[in-house]
Amino acid sequence: MIRLVTCDIDGTLLHGTETAIDAETLGEIRRLREKGVLFCPASGRQYHSLRRLFRPVADELAFICENGSVVFGPGSPGPVWGKVPLDRTEAIRLCRDIMTQPGCVINASGENTCYACNCDEEFLRHMREDVGNITEVVDDPEDIPEEIIKVSAFCRGGADAAIGYFKERWEAAFQVAVAGEQWIDFTLADKGTGLEIVCRAMGVRPEEVISFGDNYNDIPILSMVGRPYIMENAAEELREMFPNHCRRVAEVLKTL
């Protein structure tokens, strides 16, 4: 029996230029909750950004945020079920390295605030208005006033051009992953870590979970659950790894 649904956002629940969850999906989330099935977004996004995206049902959801680095239970706001902070000294060293790279901007995440350094006004506008993050500006990484759970490099020249440099220097200390055309994330957690936290808090077994994803950073969570689904437009390698494919998440939710 399925007791938990986890779902990636960008490329899975939202496609192309979509910026809002459609009414059909929100209706299915409500219906499943009435049946005792919890819906849990699993994303690299911040908690505030995810709550804004799911505003009509946000209090009823758990959230795997920042690629598994912090997990919130249902509520307004929900309790922190778990988080995986970075070593502060290493995180600040990483931030300083990012600052030396041409065209790279630091975006370091706390529990529900991100901290930008060496950025311009357009970057701030994008993070606050388009992404929906609570974003503060700091003059120096040392000024970040809380535990750092994720460091991101915004690479104006593209993540693919910078990933080799950062992997060579930092893969021994962090999980280093491309998180978008211009983003590279550094964490100690992944979405599978987040799922473990949710399952422990709920008393749910992985085989009682159905998960949806579309990219390589979804592999840890898809590999753990009883019913993994990959989007039909995902990379061929991923479609071969996970035989259950779907075009739209709502189509599968209706069958539960």
Residue spans for each PLM region:
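Mg2+-dependent phosphoryl-transfer enzymes with acidic/Ser/Thr/Gly-rich catalytic loops
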Residues: 1-4, 22, 184-256
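Asp-based phosphoryl-transfer active-site loop
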Residues: 3-18, 222
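Active-site phosphate-binding/coordination module
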Residues: 23-122
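Residue-level signal for inorganic ion chemistry
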Residues: 32, 67, 151, 195, ...
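Short active-site oxyanion
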Residues: 36-40, 59-61, 149-151, 207-209, ...
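Hydrophobic packing residues within well-ordered alpha-helices of enzyme cores
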Residues: 50-54, 162, 166, 221, ...
